[in-house]
Amino acid sequence: MNQMNVTGMNPGAGGPVGGVPMMNNGSTAPRNDGNVNNIPETMINNLNTYIYDYFLKRGYHECARALVKDESIKLNTEPPTKTSPGHRREDMNGVEGDAIMTDSKDGDKIKIPDDLPRPNLASESQQSSFLLDWFSLFWDFFWAQRKKGNSNDVRQYLQHTQNMMRLREQQHNQLLRQQPVMPRQMGPLNMRRNGMVPANLQKTVLQNNTGGLSQQQIAQLQKNQQMHMMQQMQREHSDMDMNGHRPQSPSSAENAPSPSKRPRLENGPMNGQQLAPNGRGQGQAMPGQPNSQALLMQNGLNPRAMNPAQFAGFQQQGPAAQQKSIQVYAQNLALHHSRSALNNQGIPNGLMNPGVMPNQTDLVPMPDGQGMYPMNGDYYGTNGQMAQVRAGMQTPGGQHGNHALQDYQMQLMLLEQQNKRRLMMARQEQDSMSRADGQPPMPGQQGLPPGTSPQGSRAGTSPNPNEQMKRGTPKMPQTGLPGSPNAADAMGQNRGSPAAMNFNGGQMPPDMAGGQFFMKGMPDAMGGPNGMRPPSSNPAFSGPQMGQPIPAGAVNRVPSGNWQQQQGQPMGPQQSPAQQPQSTGTPQTQNSMPPPQAPPAGANAARTSPQSQNAAPPTPQQANKPAPKKREPKDTARKRTTKKQPAAAAAAANTAATPSSEAEHPPTTPTPSTPITPQHPSSFNKAGPNPTTSAPQQPTSAPAPQPIVQQPPPDQTQQSFNDLSIPDASAFNLDFSALENPDILENFDFDTFLNTDADTAGFGFDPNISYPTDGVETGAGDGL
């Protein structure tokens, strides 16, 4: 036990206790700091006054009167005489100054005789006696020191006070040991800054009680101290970083400068740091800079608990680096506590997202809000099931994420991962947008796995469809073609592909969610776990159809396989990207032209009759008979002629078995066509003048040896496009053609088809042509 505690806190039994107020210096002599209250006569008068105040507040009036009458006892009192209430001495606004003293807690006034003066004390506002309060505290401390008290609060207070006293004493002793070195230390350092080093500095160091050290050891100490000083001077400039402070680990090697910038250690000026009498180098104590131990203690760190190597490295750092080290340590400590708290709650490894492996990628919430699914290439599991992470499917040690902080941190992590992924996709898309030979990129985006295709993982149309149309016709129509001009289409943001990968089920009405939109031939039309594209960035479809298991053999199928009907027969060729299924809310005549204004006599009779087979002779048509002579807005023959010209051109270029209904009618004289939406060549059935919504289309990509596929009669419950009021939502059927041959639209030239020059190929677009609104599918008013 040190001298302070021996003299002050632990006296012998019955010994004096007067050393407690003077525990800072361990001396029992009275302190003379110039304060008048420290004069013994004044202290005696104050004690007498407090005793008098105690008698008054306890009701001992006779004892108080005896103190007043005794002339040998001096008291600090006020004059007992009082004037009128408005002119009392030291009263404000006529209010008594001793109102608090005369009133007790219960409202009853303490009756103080008028002949007794009021005590003049600084603590007059207290209701209880100061002497009584002081004695109560003193008694607790007194008996707690002698281990006879039963108060736990007093024990804790005494233990805390003694610990703080010990730490202060140790710090004070260390400062006293370092004090003789500081004046000699600062002089050489200041001269070194000015470029001057005294010649006798080394001699002074050798003569400074270093008999136990050899010259080699002293030289090594000088080199080490010089290196540390240079590192400190280099690190002191880190405060001028424009990007702010970057926290570093206290034990990290990044604090040291690079080897190329390290100063030469040989033949350099000797460090001005002096050696202590015991031969040890002291810390770099600069004037105005806090000591390393004092800095650690100010931040609540105990230097004794640190590793000696860590503490030595901390002392060698500059003031700015020391502040950074303490800041980083506090941050790491807070992070450690937060992870420990999360581990105590059952979350493994301090993860923010329970039930998710540490190496798992983005998680997107399900539409029902009950789970998450990953945004990576393993969107479909090995058994074809959607890789969902439901709330109930968690790790054994997991816990439901119902904490606000945990949810917020998980959202931040997801947002950061999604931003990084989108940035990578945008860069890959710009790099692989087009090739030098004009061919479109492969449907996998070179350099990217199938699960990270930039175009396949986005829903909605491209910001500029006209530029993407010039890239060429890709084999997979869903990888970058423009959307439908129909702005009212409910599936407008999923124009990329007819497949259910980009199908937004959240916008689909409930009555259209039947099995007719998801075919039985799902294993033949979809790839396996690695053969399908990832979901869009905002998928909303989580219907039961996607939960169907996909056979493993479907991985080797053609990834651009077509959808099949429920009956199993293949549909016609794939429609153009502009021709997409309509929404049930706003049926429009999008995929067909209206009947001619003056149809032939037998045209109406052929509408209700079943469609003829492909091998039957074509129905006589009025389109090729009249020769166009002038531009008439209602010349329907020219409209039908211009529709067949791109159809015949594309069909002749893509298929080996063109039906006779197309080959028998050569194109007429090239004339400017009416503005129409780009249609697929097989959008109109040549076997009938008026196709219905589910009219099967002719196969144009079938090989020559295969027989022509027969088409079943149309459903009689379906209505024609002439009737715009379709009450039955089941009348629509997403009939998609069979793309067994991926070369359907390979050679179709969209640039020639959409060319606005009327003199080049005969497919020009003349904006001066006017036409009625009832025959234009994009009409939105009286005229365009």
Curated annotation (Swiss-Prot):
Extent of Basic and acidic residues compositional bias: 103-117, 234-244, 629-638
Pfam families, alphabetized: LisH
Subcellular location, record wording: Nucleus
Predominant location category: nucleus
Residue spans of biased composition, Pro residues class: 702-715
Keywords noted in UniProt: Activator, Nucleus, Transcription, Transcription regulation, Virulence
Compositionally skewed regions (Low complexity) per UniProt: 215-233, 247-259, 564-592, 644-661, 691-701
UniProt-annotated stretches for the region Disordered: 75-122, 212-295, 424-726, 764-784
Disulfide bonds: none
Bias kind Polar residues: ranges: 75-84, 453-467, 607-624
InterPro entries tied to this protein: LisH
Membrane-crossing residue ranges in chain numbering: none
One cellular-component annotation, GO: nucleus
The LisH domain, residue ranges: 43-75
Phenotype of the disrupted gene, per the record: Impairs conidiophore formation.
The keyword Transcription belongs to this UniProt entry's keyword annotation: yes
Example GO BP: positive regulation of transcription by RNA polymerase II
Complex and partners: Interacts with ptaB.
Family: Belongs to the FLO8 family.
Function: Transcription factor that controls the expression of genes related to the process of conidiation and adherence and regulates biofilm formation. Controls conidiation and adhesion primarily by affecting the expression of the three regulatory genes flbB, stuA and medA. Required for virulence in an egg and a mouse infection model.
Protein name per Swiss-Prot or TrEMBL: Transcriptional activator somA
Native organism: Aspergillus fumigatus (strain ATCC MYA-4609 / CBS 101355 / FGSC A1100 / Af293) (Neosartorya fumigata)
